[in-house]
A protein has these predicted regions:
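A generic structural signal for well-ordered alpha-helical segments
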Residues: 5, 30-31, 83, 160
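A short glycine/small-residue-enriched secondary-structure motif
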Residues: 44-60
């Protein structure tokens, strides 16, 4: 795989959260031989044993449940180690999401869009009303999850610094993923512990 990328003229690659363990031997050989350099990796790279598909949200730093948090911590430190081993200076991670039990507001938004495929979401009043309600419900639930995300990142921060790996926080895929766009600047500012 890396030989093909090199043949296209690239010297650096980013390894994704879909990198399977069976590819590691070839990746490590390519790096050791100087054929390819790794610029960055993703959390859960390589994929944990038993996972065979791309899984950026396999474990989330926003979840406070002890067992899942322990898995997130374990499977975040491992890719940090791997990043350092292959010379990558950054590891990209997703920040988790807000969870809803029974009343996930996203369902209403999706239902409305499916029932009204012809509307323009930017101008349709019905859609805007449902979306505003969904955003308000999301906003009300964010604080507890957000605190957990920040605490989780703080748990791996020193380890990443020790290994010479920066943590990169990637954009969201879904409505309920963190951070919401309006909070991103404040989030980044809050990570600057050294001024």
């Amino acid at each position: 795989m890396l030989a093909e990328i090199k043949a296209l003229g690239f010297d650096y690659v980013e390894l994704s959260h879909g990198t399977k363990i069976v590819l590691l031997e070839g990746i490590l050989r390519a790096v050791e031989e100087g054929m390819m350099k790794i610029s960055s990796t993703h959390n859960f790279c390589p994929l944990p044993m038993g996972i065979t598909h791309s899984a950026p949200n396999l474990f989330e730093p926003s979840v406070s449940a002890t067992q899942e948090h322990a898995q997130w911590l374990r499977h975040t430190k491992r890719p940090i180690e791997f990043s350092a081993r292959v010379g990558a200076t950054a590891m990209v991670t997703h920040l988790g999401s807000v969870h809803f039990f029974w009343s996930n507001p996203v369902r209403k938004v999706k239902r409305y869009l499916r029932a009204n495929p012809e509307i323009d979401p930017a101008t349709d009043e019905g859609y805007r009303k449902i979306l505003t309600k969904a955003c308000n419900k999301l906003r009300n639930r964010i604080p507890a999850y957000w605190e957990q995300v920040q605490a989780s990142l703080e748990e791996v921060r020193a380890y990443a610094l020790e290994k010479g790996v920066m943590l990169g926080c990637e954009n969201r895929e879904k409505f309920q993923e963190l951070p919401v766009d309006a909070d991103y600047a404040e989030f980044i500012k809050g990570l600057d512990k050294d001024g």
